[in-house]
Each structure stands twice: as C-alpha cells, then as structure tokens.
C-alpha cells in the first residue's frame, strides 16, 4: 500500500489562509513510521528536475535567523496577488536580511546558471547553498525594483540530488517569485 500525509500551512500572514500540501509516508521493516520529511516534491515520489522555472511558493522551508511566529507581522510568507476570477500569482513576500526559502529536493545535472525573479525595495544578494546554513555556492545580486526582474549567477553545485536554500542578505525587503535553472 502507498500511504500519504496531507497537511496545511498558513499563507498570507494570517490564521485563515492555507495551502494544502502532501508527502509520501514510508515504513520501517518493523512497521513503524519515521518522521515524514517535508519537501517541495509532494507526492511526486522523486526529486524535482533542476531544469526550467519553478514557483517560489513550493519552498518547504521559510525562515529567518530570528525565532518568530510564522504569522507574525513582517515575517516572510507566501502571498497571492489576484482579483476574483483571475489566475493567482503567488510569491514569497517580506524577505528581509537573513530570510531563507528552502527547497527539497532538486536533481542537478549540468546546471550552469540559476536565476531568481524578485521585486521590492531591497539591495543585496540572494545567497545560494545546498544545506541549511551551509557553504555559499553562488550569489545573485538584486536591487530596488517595483516590477519583477530576473537576475542570475553561475553556481558551484555538483551533479546529484541536493536541497537549495536561497537566503537574502542586504537592506530592505524583497519578494521572491520564481527560481530557474539553465
């Protein structure tokens, strides 16, 4: 049998808006269920291919260096921008210095460039790493803009299955819409 875990996480910085998520459940030989890891893959059953563009709202970890309630004012959060009847644009808002969006897992093969689409009143870099608080493997410069702008870097990520953590370091706050692989 295949077992799955379905859960919700808060969005829009309040207790009422939720995003549905799901993960595969595995069993040990003794029939026990180890803690189910939260990933960006959902029920896909395998890592995401590091090619093309992915929306930032699939980040499975969103955090800062300061402990806070995940619905606290100003805390990074998944937001939507739309009016009734329109397709929804989702992104991570309120990314200030130390804010991190973590994605688990991507299968990297020959990735030469990673791009992010950001907008906001911020100046600094998006640091890339393959481990939480790990070695920086690339930096993407970002600046002040009130429209979505893509910027990129050539990261030092070996082929294989890795997490990707994107951490803003700088002044102000920005929004993260997508991450792209070339």
Model segments located where?
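Carbohydrate-active catalytic/glycan-binding domains of CAZyme proteins
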Residues: 1-139, 143-182
């Amino acid at each position: 049998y295949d077992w799955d875990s379905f859960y919700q996480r808060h969005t829009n910085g309040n207790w009422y808006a939720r995003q549905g998520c799901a993960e595969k459940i595995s069993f040990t030989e003794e029939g026990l269920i180890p803690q189910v890891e939260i990933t960006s893959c959902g029920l896909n059953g395998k890592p995401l291919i590091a090619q093309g563009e992915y929306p930032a709202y699939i980040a499975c970890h969103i955090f800062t260096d300061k402990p806070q309630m995940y619905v606290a004012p100003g805390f990074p959060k998944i937001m939507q921008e739309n009016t009734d009847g329109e397709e929804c644009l989702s992104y991570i808002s309120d990314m200030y210095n130390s804010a991190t969006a973590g994605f688990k897992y991507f299968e990297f093969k020959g990735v030469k460039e990673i791009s992010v689409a950001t907008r906001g009143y911020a100046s600094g870099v998006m640091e890339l790493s393959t481990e939480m608080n790990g070695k920086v493997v690339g930096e993407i410069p970002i600046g002040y803009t009130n429209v979505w702008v893509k910027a990129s870097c050539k990261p030092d990520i070996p082929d294989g299955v890795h997490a990707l953590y994107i951490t803003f370091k700088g002044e102000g706050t920005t929004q993260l819409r997508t991450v792209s692989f070339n």
